[in-house]
Amino acid sequence: MTRPADPSPDRRVAVEIAVQDAASARTARASGADRVELCSALAATGGVTPSIGLVEAVVAVGLPVHVLIRPRPGGFVHDADERAVMLRDVRAALAAGAAGVVSGGLTADGRVDQDLLARLVDATGDAAFTFHRAIDAVDDRLAALDALLAAGVGRVLTSGGAVRAGDGVAALADLVARADGRLEIQAGGGVTVEAIPALVRAGVDAIHLSARRRMVAARVGPGGGEAAHDVADGEVVAAAVAAAREAGGRVRRGALPNGEGTDPRDTVG
């Protein structure tokens, strides 16, 4: 099914903020974000599954919450024990009020783990399922996207295989074209406010960023880990939302400079 024409004057690009606490979720809401992805240990591990107590606290903030389901750091190939934990965590997160989950896995030879994916999608039911950045570790992203489409996945979070999504614009545009409105492409991975216009021109449906700043701990000691943690910066969130709205409107109206409102791949160096 192709994406229906957007009847609005502007193309609406959603902004999702990666958060690790309820205060950051409140910041995201106050600054205009559309939803949050909730995880733990983002900077240290790339993100792992948060506690159910934290899920409940963030759900209470009022924004749609999409919970990362990843049992450990260190890649995306999961054994039987980890798969069982992931399925339990999906059910627990949804029972705690999450709007959806963010998860997935790969086979050892670098393809989408379709058996695990089918189980995760089934456990998610009618809630939203986003395939996470494991897609950036596959050998063939377009083939991986086809596997996600076949499994009924609704959204994928990707940098286009680049370290930073802003450097993966051409690949993201290819994914958008391949998806053809059947699945949302959400750009994420090192996203800065300055990169957002180019990402919107690539045709992505949503922008994902942490918009974080460092908070130095008041007191630490042996065994306490790093002496700082990350929280959402309201000014950065607001700037990202404004950039996405402005770029979406300009793409719709064909007002971007240098012909940049046409084919996004034409402007990629």
Which functions belong to the PLM regions below?
Residues G47-P73, V112-A134, D167-T192, A228-G254:
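Alpha-helix-loop-beta-strand connector modules within alpha/beta enzyme cores
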Residues R29-A30, V55-H66, R91-A96, L120-T124, ...:
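Acidic (Asp/Glu)-rich catalytic clusters
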Residues R35-A57, P71-H78, V101-D113, G160, ...:
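Glycine-rich, proline-tolerant flexible connector loops at the mouths of alpha/beta enzymes
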Residues P9-D21, I69-V85, T130-R141:
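Active-site mouth loops of central-metabolism enzymes
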Residues G100-V112, A134-L175, A211-V231:
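Glycine/Thr-rich beta-alpha phosphate-binding loop at enzyme active sites
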